[in-house]
Amino acid sequence: MSIKRLVQLFVAVVVLHSCGKKVSTEEFNSDFSLFKDYILNFSSGLVSSNTDIRVTLAFDKAEWQPNQEIDQSLFDISPAVKGKMMALTSNTIAFIPEKPLEQDTEYRIVFKLSKLIKTPKNLSEFKFSIKTLKQDFIVNVLDLQSYNREWQFLN
């Protein structure tokens, strides 16, 4: 009888945990003002699905050459995206996706700053998010009209 109760309790805890609320974007994103000594700029807000994800650092990495592929593990992106990390300049890195990002999707990025420079423990990861635009274009064509034999127009 007690094993049955334990199993029921376990199932109840699992169900309640799986129904927990998701962390909002505001709660996920790091406070940029805390990172101003390390990060100058980063991708944010609404972006095209064909864009890359960039972070501009407040310091230079002399060992980086323009368009050099760098460590993939600097970014954790959710939902997962395949692509490569590139050093665009000595202080700008970009994640370049293999395929365009999904439209109308929020991506959460964790930038592991402590892999590049020594930081206080509370500043080891910079979290930010972007949302891709929904590409939407509608053309309504009614019929073809003509002015004369050489000129036509659409209604």
Where are these regions (language model features)?
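C-terminal motif of bacterial Sec signal peptides marking the signal peptidase cleavage site
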Residues: V15-S18
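Sec-dependent signal peptide recognition
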Residues: K4-V11
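Acidic, low-complexity Ser/Thr/Gly/Pro-rich repeat segments typical of extracellular/periplasmic
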Residues: G20-N155
